């Protein structure tokens, strides 16, 4: 049976592919946007809701009867973190989530589940320690953002709605994110490790993170789900596999101090070590298509290896 699924952040890397997958399988993605002009470029979507996340009453009719709300909205963290921009990062997540929960509270027919994005930044810098969904939050700006973000989402439970939190790691796609930014350096033979190279990376193939959202839409449940593959790798291993998939060397190194000079505090997203395991994700019955990095790289970069 076709499901209506409301999405915020649908023009982002995950949102675009998720909306397309929903459409392809016969569901109805309903896109919420402050400015739906960009969203209307997604030919496979025909329901849009223009909303500034303030007064929800004018849009409630279009939100009634949705099976699930998917919250992917949030300003990119891949910018230099000035104090004003830190507030943008925080507010774009917490205020949007607050608005969604408020809208849900006013609906006559509430969704079965709110699936709200978070990040593995929740755990902070974990060094070589393995962490899973039961581990406590860490320290630092991103950890604080994730805590506030998740707390806001959990308020939907007060209205009888299940809440799934997806703590997403580094999403691999040649269409955006970290992988797209790293490919050019390798193509010009100057690719290599960032920082010490020993820091752990928790990654996930774009198809797997989209499938995880579909899994949670189809199986509404409370809980936290790490959106990462079961096989985290060190930065050195990551760039080696990237170079191998592109048939290019991975000999260069960018030292930590240079990254800090270039990006300031934001460099922590590259230099911090996170060895995150999707224990509860797998326990929920989700199966990864690409659990191993070499297989993921081969699939994602096959167009470059021809």
Regions found by a protein language model. Give the residues of each.
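Mid/C-terminal beta-alpha module of Rossmann-like enzyme folds, strongest
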Residues: 218-265, 298, 304-306
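NAD(P)-dependent short-chain dehydrogenase/reductase
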Residues: 143, 147, 155-165, 169-200
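Alpha-helical substrate-binding/gating segment
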Residues: 183-191, 198-233
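C-terminal amphipathic/interface module of NAD(P)-dependent oxidoreductases
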Residues: 268-306
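N-terminal Rossmann NAD(P)H-binding glycine-rich loop of SDR-like oxidoreductase domains
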Residues: 5-25
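Catalytic helix-loop patch of NAD(P)-dependent Rossmann-fold dehydrogenases
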Residues: 91, 95, 127-165
């Amino acid at each position: 049976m076709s499901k209506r699924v409301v999405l915020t952040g649908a023009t982002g890397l995950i949102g675009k592919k998720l909306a397309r997958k929903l459409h392809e399988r016969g569901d109805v993605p309903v896109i919420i946007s402050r400015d739906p002009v960009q969203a209307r470029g997604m030919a496979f979507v025909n329901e849009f809701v223009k909303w500034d996340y303030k007064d929800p009453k004018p849009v409630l009719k279009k939100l009634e009867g949705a099976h699930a709300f998917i919250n992917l909205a949030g300003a990119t963290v891949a910018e230099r973190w000035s104090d004003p921009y830190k507030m943008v990062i925080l507010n774009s997540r917490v205020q949007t989530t607050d608005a969604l929960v408020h809208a849900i509270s006013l609906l006559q027919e509430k969704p079965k589940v709110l699936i709200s994005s978070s990040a593995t930044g929740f755990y902070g810098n974990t060094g070589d320690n393995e962490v899973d969904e039961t581990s406590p939050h860490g320290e630092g700006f991103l950890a604080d953002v994730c805590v506030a973000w998740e707390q806001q989402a959990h308020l939907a439970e007060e209205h009888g709605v299940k809440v799934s939190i997806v703590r997403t790691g580094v999403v691999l796609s040649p269409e955006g994110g970290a992988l797209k930014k790293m490919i050019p350096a390798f193509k010009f033979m100057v690719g290599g490790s960032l920082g010490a190279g020993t820091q752990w990376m928790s990654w996930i193939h774009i198809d797997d993170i989209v499938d995880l959202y579909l899994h949670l839409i189809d199986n509404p449940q409370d809980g936290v789900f790490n959106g990462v593959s079961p096989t985290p790798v060190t930065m050195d291993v990551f760039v080696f596999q990237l170079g191998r998939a592109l048939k290019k060397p991975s000999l260069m190194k960018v030292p930590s101090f240079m990254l800090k000079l270039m990006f300031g505090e934001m460099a922590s997203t590259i230099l911090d070590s996170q060895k995150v395991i999707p224990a509860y994700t797998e326990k929920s019955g989700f199966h990864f298509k690409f659990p191993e990095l070499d297989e993921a790289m081969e699939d994602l970069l096959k167009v470059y290896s021809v």
